[in-house]
């Protein structure tokens, strides 16, 4: 095995034509993401590194392939994703996305960290190391997301410190608890300070923040935001020195709204991310390739869109060895025939072809899952009394209204059906009962609320994918189906369950922390299709992504009204409120 010094020497010699290269991709239309031009060249690779772009056919290699004039772009980079939201392990996630041209992702494992703490982070790192894709980790900053709910773990600065110098760790993940930052809460500032001292990147989470609050985030050293929903917000972030990662996921779709913010003078401060995207959409669409194609369809030049998806994101996360097709950079590149679709014909990682025509060319590997992460659901036996939502004064209530395909909700104050002092769900008014039950430590705390907008005509839906604390979450038209759904969630140790008229219509077990499956992606996709089909039976007019929208109604850091296991939470005032208004 050659040493790093020997490899460096070989790379230099190979760049001068004095040593045979490992691989040459000939006759490529190479994307220059610095000058935003195309140039015809042969890409010369040694030891996984591009050592030359040859214009005169003067290099030789052990292996040669002809691009036949096709476009070749740098491997695409996702700047912010929670791999757990794909419901796949990192290794299987990698196998889904590499064929789409994604060769690097920056992940925040705060979903599994909220369930299993530091051990959850370690599992993600271990599994990521077995992936063909480069998976870099941002250390979860907000576990739990707030102090107003019960998660499976609490991560202090001391808990994160052992991970700071891990080769796959790039920084501190999205800082969601903005009052903790702006009020100078010591625990949060210690995490930020540790990251700054290690010269790591600090991600933001600036949902709904005003410009002066962004100033406070910047003063703390927070460098990115992926929560912009308007062009004006994006411009403000960039003007205050941030990188903006444009999000296009399964529920949050902000790309079209944010594109007007990108101009020639500020484009280098933008990148793409998915944040949360389900396995079926990842398999069908990909992720960042889809964003690039959409941006091109909306009028952005192909090279500009490719720049956002490669070098911009690489530089944001100080990955200065990738994102560019030039000597000295990683040999991560993608062969593309049609820029309008961005469909990858072949993908190379570190100079090795790892995917072709949508299929992986390598075998699947995976890390061992710790036993208690496989058994993480501990629910109490639920009864009608457990789900009774009482009113003392009248019928006026604080009601959560979902916004289809968005993470935000509206806060309504309206009259609701009440019979003998107890809320009664109404299909006609689309007012359903919502419950969050603590499932980590046998605390049995239960938050109850009322939600409008899901449109269920019957039945109930339950899950343990309830961002970010991932307690058990259930919505329904009646208590009996809600109780059955929760009981089944306990039996399968997490996942999704859909029930109607006392019958289980569909389920998807997620036995790894109640968040991820250990089955291959294709099988997971089929299970997810079963859930979508069952949802159509509960709501025949359903026209939005129910499951992902549903999974965020318990996240008390995104406005306006959310439900946790400790009760209804007003994100605007950052405090609990009563359901009865």
Swiss-Prot record:
Q: Which family does it belong to?
A: Belongs to the metallo-dependent hydrolases superfamily. Adenine deaminase family.
Q: Which domain of life is it from?
A: Bacteria
Signal peptide start and end residues: none
Q: Which cofactor does it need?
A: Mn(2+)
Keyword terms: Hydrolase, Manganese
According to UniProt, the name of this protein is Adenine deaminase
- What SUPFAM superfamilies does this protein's entry cite? Composite domain of metallo-dependent hydrolases (SSF51338), Metallo-dependent hydrolases (SSF51556)
Hydrolase listed as a keyword: yes
Q: Which GO molecular function annotations are given, in alphabetical order?
A: adenine deaminase activity
Write down the EC number: 3.5.4.2
Spell out the reaction equation it catalyses: adenine + H2O + H(+) = hypoxanthine + NH4(+)
**InterPro entries the UniProt entry points to:** Adenine_deam (IPR006679), Adenine_deam_C (IPR026912), Amidohydro-rel (IPR006680), Metal-dep_hydrolase_composite (IPR011059), Metal_Hydrolase (IPR032466)
Pfam families, alphabetized? Adenine_deam_C, Amidohydro_1
Organism, by scientific name, is Lysinibacillus sphaericus (strain C3-41)
Give a GO biological-process term: adenine catabolic process
Gene that produces this protein: ade
- Has the keyword Metal-binding been applied to this entry? no
């Amino acid at each position: 095995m050659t040493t790093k010094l020997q490899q460096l020497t070989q790379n230099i010699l190979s760049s001068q034509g004095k040593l045979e290269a490992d691989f040459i991709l000939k006759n490529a239309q190479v994307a220059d993401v610095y000058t935003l031009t195309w140039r015809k060249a042969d890409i010369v690779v040694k030891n996984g590194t591009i050592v030359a772009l040859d214009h005169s056919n003067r290099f030789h290699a052990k292996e040669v392939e002809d691009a036949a004039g096709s476009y070749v772009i740098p491997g695409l980079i996702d700047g912010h994703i929670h791999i757990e939201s794909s419901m796949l392990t990192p290794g299987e996630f990698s196998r889904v996305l590499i064929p789409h041209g994604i060769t690097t992702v920056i992940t925040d494992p705060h979903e599994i960290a909220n369930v299993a703490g530091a051990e959850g982070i370690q599992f993600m790192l271990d599994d990521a190391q077995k992936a063909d894709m480069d998976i870099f980790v941002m250390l979860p900053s907000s576990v739990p997301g707030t102090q107003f709910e019960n998660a499976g773990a609490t991560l202090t600065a001391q808990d994160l410190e052992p991970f700071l110098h891990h080769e796959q760790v790039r920084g501190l993940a999205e800082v969601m608890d903005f009052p903790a930052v702006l009020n100078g809460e010591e625990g949060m500032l210690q995490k930020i300070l540790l990251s700054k001292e290690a010269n790591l990147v600090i991600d933001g989470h600036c949902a709904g923040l005003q410009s002066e609050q962004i100033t406070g985030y910047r003063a703390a050293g927070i460098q990115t935001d992926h929560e912009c929903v308007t062009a004006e917000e994006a411009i403000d972030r960039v003007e205050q020195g941030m990188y903006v990662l444009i999000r296009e996921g399964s529920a949050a779709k902000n790309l079209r709204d944010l594109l007007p913010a990108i101009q020639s003078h500020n484009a280098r401060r933008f990148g793409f991310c998915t944040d949360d995207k389900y396995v079926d959409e990842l398999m069908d669409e990909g992720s960042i390739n889809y964003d690039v194609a959409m941006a091109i369809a909306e009028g952005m030049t192909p090279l500009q869109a490719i720049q956002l998806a490669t070098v911009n994101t690489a530089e944001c996360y100080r990955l200065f060895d990738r994102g560019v097709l030039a000597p000295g950079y990683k040999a991560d590149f993608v062969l593309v025939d049609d820029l309008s679709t961005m469909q990858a014909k072949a993908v190379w990682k570190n100079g090795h072809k790892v995917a072709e025509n949508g299929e992986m060319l390598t075998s699947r590997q995976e890390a061992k899952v710790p036993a208690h992460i496989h058994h993480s659901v501990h629910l109490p036996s639920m009864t009608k009394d457990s789900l009774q939502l009482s009113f003392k004064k009248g019928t006026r209530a604080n009601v959560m209204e979902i916004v289809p395909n968005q993470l935000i909700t509206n806060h309504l104050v309206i009259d609701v059906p009440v019979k003998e002092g107890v809320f009664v769900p109404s299909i006609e008014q689309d007012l359903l009962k919502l419950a969050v039950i603590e499932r980590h430590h046998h605390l049995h705390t239960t938050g109850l609320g009322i939600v409008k907008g899901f449109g269920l005509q019957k039945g109930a839906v339950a899950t343990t994918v309830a961002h970010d604390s991932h307690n058990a979450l259930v919505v329904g038209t009646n208590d009996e189906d809600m109780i059955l759904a929760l009981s089944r969630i306990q039996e399968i140790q997490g996942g999704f369950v859909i029930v109607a008229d006392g019958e289980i219509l569909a389920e998807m077990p997620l036995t790894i922390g109640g968040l991820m499956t250990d089955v291959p992606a294709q099988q997971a996709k089929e299970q997810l299709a079963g859930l979508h089909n069952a949802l159509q039976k509960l709501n025949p007019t359903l026209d939005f992504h129910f499951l992902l929208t549903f999974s965020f109604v318990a996240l008390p850091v995104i406005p306006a009204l959310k439900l946790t296991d400790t009760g209804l939470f007003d994100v605007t005032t950052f405090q609990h409120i009563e359901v009865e208004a």
